[in-house]
């Protein structure tokens, strides 16, 4: 045997698991594209002046088992105290049936945002259920399908209040003094760029302030007080002031709906509905508003529509409000939301139903009443008489109480003057309450739970009678039908089967990087050491998180060529916003706050102009030449014209057109020459890692989509993470946090997310990916992504011309297929091809972005040659079908393309088409058949007949 022990140990085994094509397949594809090796191919494609001489030093690869053991040892450094800190975060009990069948199920977590509704009906139904939960609990008319977290939802509510306000000259936003501090932090950050003045005061003093366009109230207040705001809201409405309420979703099960009290906007975190704290996220926010404001709402909204056969079908409604269409005029820059987490919360409500939720909420409240009664019996004073789950307890010996709590491995809220905060939750037991008595009163308190229970059961006054809900919630059958585990399991499976995810087929969406989310990467997110930590626990309890985050940040610094990384932004769009804020504050620190012009190429992703607008910048578009590259002459002219007002350029690399622009360094130099900064959008980082880097190219700041390049799954539309890398001069200007000091960051800036490290509990996914791939594997992943894209382009270019190529006719990691000539010639559109691909078992590529009338294909490195060939064969077969239409064999108005997709019921219905049933549903001998459950959606009907809540069960049958 000639192999060494090191070879037999095969520490790089995961690289071969992650990368789809094996060595033989790679060589076949290299031969097909006319390249000798991966190095030769990337050497030809990537401009010489930006190629790294050696890959970034992020270490050797580790096996799945070694990496898991290493991360487990790090996780064990976290201390799992029982946290009663509250402040919008509580421990939960995630039902195992949801844990196993959704959170740990690739059929749910590997799907993409449901832009293609025909292959997304399952998660769209779950999201519609989420909207129904929101509507029932808030008492409002229109709900979104989730926002990023409660604090960013508050910022969106403020922006929306200004959009809909009739007080056009008012420029002040009032925040009640008992709003969560992290929410106030994010609101202040957003208000600064919008030019709003934020006033913080007791809610009852709001009427003392002039020129207020909007008000933010908290129900329940951050220290636990239940407010009856009915009269105040009525007075505010009489003055045309828009009222927003941040609400606790579990408290709303028992309390009067804020919408019923007159609130215009209600939002909050859905974390309490089954989603672990995870050191801050990811969690879904809910958001609702009055019907009259629906077209000003931020984020995704699921609506009920019809398909081509007239059957009920679901889709994302009113997309013309959103960044991918309206760009800088969009309501927000939201792209990723929190679909997976919203669906967990939605199914938590389905599983428990109204009876179960009321039992949980009443039990939490009863234990809180018992705790309050015992403390008051022993002479302690409560700051608030009315509460749901949170007590603000005044204590003389605060240090002693906190010391006893620490000794008992308990966290209390400690930032309240002369008092401690205690928030109970669904995991709290009577034993926990007895332990709290001992911490606050000493061991000899002599209190008895059962005796206290009898007292409070007959005489609880902690919720005002006027604040008790008197209407029914969750009356729709979906919330009253699936309470046995068998029924719940089957319901979830029925939803999953309606959708197309990576566990069934390649999802070749350009600009989306739908790569493998390996099981070994996903396992740590459910470890209790990561899942159960409160984001505001003492830092010495989170040493494992700190070590993991520091290591990940160090690796990302090396991979990007930057000097520092901030982990706070909890989506790519948030990363863009944070990066642009860093640029803005950098200019202000140099007394150049007048620099507010942001140059953006015409090809840019829609979030770029939307984020620039949010950051208070003016967008100036830079033209692209006939080859899809930035027009350097136009760039120079626009930069010179902007002069001392130039703030930055936002550029994507490789370009959104799928090529490595030769002049990227010159682009950076031109912008720097005029005093601007270079923001390099990290959307296409999967074609850079190990080959080049933003810092090496000459950029100053980038966001990284960890849910693209670094393997966090898309979750059907979230979660995502968008940390930013910055050069040293921008490091002081990255987001900070008002509650938690971020170790190693000398920043005094405001927050952009509720938690200091954003969605911290999904960072282990990226840690695992980098650790298992190592420097060698990461570079190879980028190279194979480029090879796969060029293989597809070379094999399809005769049937579907590739719109843009770089030198030698190559593309980067994705390619744009130009459908416009075919459409002009035959009448068949890119939409028809996209829908026909469903019949072949594929999710469509990205349609009409960045160029109308095109399909953008990104295969990623994870797809094998077998799957690539299957896709190519499907596309070639579709081209042959188009030729049949062109030849007149099938009429333009009745052929397999315009009628696609085809569903099972059509097989047994009367068949009057000029093509066979077999051609319709088993084209080209498709073996592993995916069946869509609806035909093509009628988008016009959906927006003209907007309906965004649950429909009768019979409509689905």
Swiss-Prot record:
InterPro entries (alphabetical): GcvP, GDC-P_C, GDC-P_N, GDC_P, PyrdxlP-dep_Trfase, PyrdxlP-dep_Trfase_major, PyrdxlP-dep_Trfase_small
GO molecular function, one term: glycine binding
Broadest EC class assigned to this enzyme: oxidoreductase
Name of protein: Glycine dehydrogenase (decarboxylating)
Complex and partners: The glycine cleavage system is composed of four proteins: P, T, L and H.
Keywords: Oxidoreductase, Pyridoxal phosphate
Residues annotated with N6-(pyridoxal phosphate)lysine modification: 708
Membrane-spanning parts: none
Reactions this protein catalyses: N(6)-[(R)-lipoyl]-L-lysyl-[glycine-cleavage complex H protein] + glycine + H(+) = N(6)-[(R)-S(8)-aminomethyldihydrolipoyl]-L-lysyl-[glycine-cleavage complex H protein] + CO2
GO cellular component, one term: glycine cleavage complex
Keyword Oxidoreductase tagged: yes
Biological processes, Gene Ontology terms: glycine decarboxylation via glycine cleavage system
Function: The glycine cleavage system catalyzes the degradation of glycine. The P protein binds the alpha-amino group of glycine through its pyridoxal phosphate cofactor; CO(2) is released and the remaining methylamine moiety is then transferred to the lipoamide cofactor of the H protein.
One Pfam family cited in the UniProt record for this chain: GDC-P
Annotated family: Belongs to the GcvP family.
NCBIfam families (UniProt xref): gcvP, PRK04366.1
EC number, as in UniProt: 1.4.4.2
Cofactor(s) recorded in Swiss-Prot or TrEMBL: pyridoxal 5'-phosphate
């Amino acid at each position: 045997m000639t192999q060494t022990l090191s070879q037999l140990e095969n520490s790089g085994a995961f690289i071969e698991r992650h990368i789809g094509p094996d060595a033989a397949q790679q060589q076949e594809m290299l031969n097909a594209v006319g390249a000798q090796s991966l190095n030769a191919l990337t050497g030809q494609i990537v401009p010489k002046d930006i190629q790294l001489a050696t890959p970034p030093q992020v270490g050797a690869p580790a096996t799945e088992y070694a990496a898991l053991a290493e991360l487990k040892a790090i996780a064990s450094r976290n201390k799992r105290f029982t946290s009663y800190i509250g402040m919008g975060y509580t421990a939960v009990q995630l039902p195992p049936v949801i844990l196993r069948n959704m959170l740990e199920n690739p059929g749910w977590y590997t799907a993409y945002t449901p832009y293609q509704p025909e292959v997304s009906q399952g998660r769209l139904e779950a999201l519609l259920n989420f909207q129904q939960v929101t509507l029932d609990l808030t008492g409002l008319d229109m709900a979104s399908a989730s926002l990023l977290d409660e604090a960013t939802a508050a910022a969106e509510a403020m922006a929306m209040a200004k959009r809909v306000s009739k007080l056009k000259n008012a420029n002040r936003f009032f925040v009640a003094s008992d709003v969560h501090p992290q929410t106030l932090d994010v609101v202040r950050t957003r208000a600064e760029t919008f030019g709003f003045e934020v006033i913080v005061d007791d809610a009852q003093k709001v009427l003392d302030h002039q020129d207020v366009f909007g008000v933010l109230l908290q129900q329940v207040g951050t220290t636990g007080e239940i407010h009856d705001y009915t009269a105040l809201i009525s007075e505010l409405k009489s003055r045309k002031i828009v009222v927003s309420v941040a609400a606790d979703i579990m408290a709303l099960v028992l309390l009067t709906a804020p919408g019923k009290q007159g609130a215009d906007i209600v939002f909050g975190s859905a974390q309490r509905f089954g989603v672990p704290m995870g050191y801050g996220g990811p969690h879904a926010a809910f958001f609702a508003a009055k019907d009259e404001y629906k077209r000003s709402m931020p984020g995704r909204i699921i609506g009920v529509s019809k398909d081509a056969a007239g059957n009920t079908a679901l889709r994302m409604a009113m997309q013309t409000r959103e960044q991918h269409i309206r760009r800088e005029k969009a309501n927000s820059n939201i792209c990723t939301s929190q679909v997976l987490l919203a669906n967990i919360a939605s199914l938590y409500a389905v599983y428990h139903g109204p009876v179960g939720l009321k039992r949980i909420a009443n039990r939490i409240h009863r234990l809180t009443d018992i705790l309050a009664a015992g403390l008051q019996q022993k002479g302690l004073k409560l700051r608030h008489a009315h509460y749901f789950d949170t007590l603000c307890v005044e204590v003389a010996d605060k240090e002693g109480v906190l010391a006893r709590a620490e000794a008992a491995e308990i966290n209390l809220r400690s930032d309240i003057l002369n008092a401690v905060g205690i928030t109970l939750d669904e995991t709290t037991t009577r034993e926990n309450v007895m332990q709290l008595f001992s911490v606050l009163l000493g061991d000899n308190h002599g209190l008895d739970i059962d005796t206290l229970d009898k007292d409070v059961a007959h005489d609880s006054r902690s919720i005002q009678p006027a604040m008790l809900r008197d209407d029914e919630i969750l009356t729709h059958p979906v919330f009253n039908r699936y309470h046995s585990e068998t029924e719940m399991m089957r319901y979830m499976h029925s939803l999953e089967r309606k959708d197309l995810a990576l566990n069934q087929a390649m999802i070749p969406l350009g600009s989306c990087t739908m790569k493998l989310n390996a099981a070994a990467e996903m396992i740590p997110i459910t470890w209790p050491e990561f899942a159960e930590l409160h984001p505001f626990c003492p830092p010495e309890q989170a040493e494992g998180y700190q070590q993991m985050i520091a290591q990940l940040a160090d690796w990302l610094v090396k991979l990007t060529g930057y000097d520092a990384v901030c982990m706070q932004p909890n989506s790519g769009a948030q990363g863009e916003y944070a990066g642009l804020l860093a640029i803005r504050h950098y200019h202000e620190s140099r007394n150049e706050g007048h620099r507010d012009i942001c140059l953006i190429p015409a090809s840019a992703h829609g979030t770029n102009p939307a984020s620039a607008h949010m950051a208070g910048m003016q967008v100036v578009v830079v033209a692209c030449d006939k080859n899809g590259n930035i027009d350097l002459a136009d760039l120079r002219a626009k930069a010179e014209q902007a002069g001392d007002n130039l703030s930055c350029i936002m550029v994507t690399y490789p370009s959104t057109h799928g090529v490595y622009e030769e002049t990227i360094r010159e682009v950076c130099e031109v912008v720097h020459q005029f005093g601007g900064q270079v923001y390099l959008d990290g959307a296409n980082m999967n074609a850079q890692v190990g080959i080049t880097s933003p810092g090496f190219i000459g950029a100053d700041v980038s966001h990284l989509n960890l849910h693209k390049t670094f393997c966090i799954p898309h979750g059907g539309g979230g979660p995502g993470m968008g940390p930013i890398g910055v050069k040293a001069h921008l490091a002081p200007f990255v987001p900070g946090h008002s509650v938690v000091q971020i170790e190693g960051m000398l920043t005094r800036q405001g927050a952009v997310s509720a938690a200091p490290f954003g969605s911290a509990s999904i960072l282990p996914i990226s840690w695992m990916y980098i650790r298992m791939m190592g420097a060698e594997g990461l570079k190879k992943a980028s190279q194979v992504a480029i090879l796969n894209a060029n293989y597809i382009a070379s094999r399809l270019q005769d049937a579907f011309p590739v719109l843009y190529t770089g030198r030698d006719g190559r593309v980067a990691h994705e390619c744009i297929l130009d459908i416009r000539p075919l459409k002009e010639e035959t009448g068949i559109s890119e939409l028809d091809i996209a829908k026909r691909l469903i019949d072949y078992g594929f999710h469509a590529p990205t349609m009409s972005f960045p160029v109308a009338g095109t399909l953008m294909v990104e295969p990623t490195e994870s797809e094998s040659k077998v799957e690539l060939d299957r896709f190519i064969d499907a596309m070639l077969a579709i081209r042959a079908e188009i030729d049949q239409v062109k030849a007149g064999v099938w009429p333009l108005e009745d052929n397999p393309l315009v009628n696609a997709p085809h569903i099972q019921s059509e097989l047994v219905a009367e068949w009057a088409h000029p093509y066979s049933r077999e051609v319709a549903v088993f084209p080209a001998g498709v073996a592993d058949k995916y069946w869509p459950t609806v035909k093509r959606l009628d988008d016009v009907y959906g927006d003209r007949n907007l309906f965004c809540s649950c429909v009768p069960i019979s409509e689905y049958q």
